[in-house]
A protein has these predicted regions:
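C-terminal catalytic domains of large/alpha subunits in multi-subunit enzymes
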Residues: 1-144
Length: 144
């Protein structure tokens, strides 16, 4: 993905439990080539926190409605990734002095959803046509 003069990539490794429909991202590798990197430690923090947000979006986060009104208005109704569910994250940075400068923040969460969806297809042979991937949806998909 190209964003703000930066090139992003994401690779998700997942585990799918067919009986329960639980999808777990076990490892995520995120990479960026954004020109000259000024603060690699801060960029790594942005990359890793973006992965946590993106994986949460891919697996859990969903705004729900009833008769046109939002019903996911509390933390008990709007699910997010727990600390126990956060995958191992590897951040890869490529710095190039000849390219100028690029952005290095919100692209991280943007590559997560397609990476998780691709890993789901690779693991199951089934295309998920929406996100998130809650267990009920996954079991329905796997039953065909």
């Amino acid at each position: 993905m190209i964003r703000e003069n930066s090139y992003w990539m994401g690779i998700a490794e997942i585990a799918v439990t067919p009986d329960t429909g639980v999808v777990q991202v076990t490892k995520f590798t995120i990479g960026i080539e954004c020109g000259k990197i000024i603060n690699p430690r801060q960029l790594e923090r942005c990359m890793k926190s973006g992965v946590v947000m993106g994986v949460s979006e891919a697996l859990k986060e969903e705004v729900t409605f009833d008769k046109g009104k939002i019903t996911s208005t509390t933390w008990s109704r709007y699910k997010i990734l727990t600390m126990a569910e956060v995958p191992e994250v590897k951040a890869v940075q490529i710095s190039r002095d000849d390219k100028g400068y690029g952005g290095g923040s919100e692209g991280a969460n943007a590559v997560c959803t397609p990476a998780v969806a691709a890993a789901f297809f690779d693991a199951t042979g089934v295309h998920a046509r929406r996100i998130p991937l809650p267990p009920a949806y996954v079991t329905t998909l796997l039953k065909g």
